[in-house]
């Protein structure tokens, strides 16, 4: 018998009016597939946080992260194009570009936006 997680309880026990705010970085940090999760919550995601994670980090991550774990979109291991496609298909209204740690936040957001516009 497989035990349920807190996430499973939210998805199964709350009605469809319960919306989720999903962060693709932390989904990937748990070694899960963001696209599958987005598809599984189709119609129930109000906001999607787009972040990228440094290539070469062993997943899943337990405990602390190095400050350089957060990368500009397109510079890490998370393929954003299928995530954006899944988000559109799932009816996600708002996507937010984030980078928790950056030596130059303005340059980082600019680089991430250039990447997104190129998709």
Predicted features and spans:
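Surface-exposed alpha-helical segments enriched in charged/polar residues
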Residues: 12, 39, 85-88, 114
């Amino acid at each position: 018998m497989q035990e349920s997680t807190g996430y499973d309880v939210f998805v199964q026990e709350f009605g469809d009016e319960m919306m989720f705010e999903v962060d693709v970085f932390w989904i990937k940090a748990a070694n899960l597939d963001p696209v599958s999760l987005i598809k599984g919550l189709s119609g129930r995601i109000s906001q999607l946080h787009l972040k990228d994670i440094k290539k070469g980090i062993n997943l899943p991550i337990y405990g602390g992260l190095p400050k350089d774990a957060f990368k500009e979109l397109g510079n890490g291991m998370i393929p954003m194009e299928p995530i954006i496609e899944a988000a559109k298909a799932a009816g996600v209204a708002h996507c937010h570009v984030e980078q928790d740690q950056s030596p130059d936040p303005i340059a980082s957001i600019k680089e991430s936006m250039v990447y997104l516009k190129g998709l």
